[in-house]
Amino acid sequence: MQIYPLRLLPNKIDFDFMNFKKVSYSFSIILSLISFIWIGIYKFNFGIDFAGGIVIEVRLDQAPDLPKMRGVLGELGIGEVVLQNFGSERDLSIRFGSSSEENLMKNIELIKASLQSNFPYKFEYRKVDFVGPQVGRQLIEAGAMAMLFSFLAIMVYIWVRFEWYFGLGILIALVHDVILALGFMSMTKLDFNLSTIAAVLTIIGYSVNDSVVIYDRIRENLRKYHKKNITEIINLSINETLSRTILTVITTLLANLALILFGGEAIRSFSVLVFFGIIAGTYSSIFISAPILTMFANRKFNKKVIER
């Protein structure tokens, strides 16, 4: 039985990506500067994880309808409200952002009254705690360290598998993707919480995977076409992997779209940011990480790159 691969593009496609190198560099620099300026002016919409807040622990007489409950509490106008089960399905944790002292008790009573009037459950309020912003600062530091270590691990991996200048190309693309993702988060006022840190790490992984696929094809074509220059090799490699890249990004975006539409508020920031990051990562793997290799066109590519 013969298997026919799924293709969205013809087998022989010869689009000159490298002809847009300067345009793509300029475009990326402008977007990065806009992101920096926007973040500097408007900052981030820090969620409860980082800004601190109130935690109310409740036990109900039956399993609650969490999506409906999130919708009701989200309409109170007191900011982000996070509901989660802990322990059994009847135990509920309600978290919302810290307020001024005079509004603190008012918001707690507002939540209690809203739950009592909209749901037929019996509520047993077990504990009310205040989580200070100091914990948030520790989480921000931990998230920053996680991203730093991921950058370093990726650099070492690419250096071992290819050569240091390949790692430089990926590092520049990753910094570009993270800056755009943070700028997008600031512009859209997505909650900056632990799930968005996970989203940024997911974007990093996706972008690296895309770039490594192209780099592998570049290395393979360096073995096959000794007379072609590096610009021709990169163009050929991007075109040969383009169908795979488009198929992968479409299927991933469709899966992520389902999370955005049906995942609820609990993972909205994560899914929206990953959706944007997949697009940014695909763009950077084609127009940034691969074209950067032309900076080394005047030096002979290390034989280790071709032989590995």
UniProtKB/Swiss-Prot annotation:
GO terms for cellular component: plasma membrane. Keywords: Cell inner membrane, Cell membrane, Membrane, Protein transport, Translocation, Transmembrane, Transmembrane helix, Transport. It is a multi-pass membrane protein. Pfam families: Sec_GG, SecD_SecF_C. Its main location: membrane. InterPro entries: SecD/SecF_arch_bac, SecD/SecF_bac, SecD/SecF_CS, SecD_SecF_C, SecD_SecF_C_bact, SecF_bac, SSD. Coiled coil: none annotated. The chain crosses the membrane at residues 28-48, 140-160, 164-184, 194-214, 246-266, 272-292. One of its GO terms (biological process) is protein transport by the Sec complex. It is found in: Cell inner membrane. GO terms for molecular function: protein-transporting ATPase activity. Part of the Sec protein translocase complex. Interacts with the SecYEG preprotein conducting channel. SecDF uses the proton motive force (PMF) to complete protein translocation after the ATP-dependent function of SecA. PANTHER family: PROTEIN TRANSLOCASE SUBUNIT SECF (PTHR30081:SF8), PROTEIN-EXPORT MEMBRANE PROTEIN SEC (PTHR30081). NCBIfam families: 2A0604s01, transloc_SecF. Belongs to the SecD/SecF family. SecF subfamily. Forms a complex with SecD. Part of the essential Sec protein translocation apparatus which comprises SecA, SecYEG and auxiliary proteins SecDF-YajC and YidC. This is Protein translocase subunit SecF. It comes from Rickettsia felis (strain ATCC VR-1525 / URRWXCal2) (Rickettsia azadi). The gene is secF.
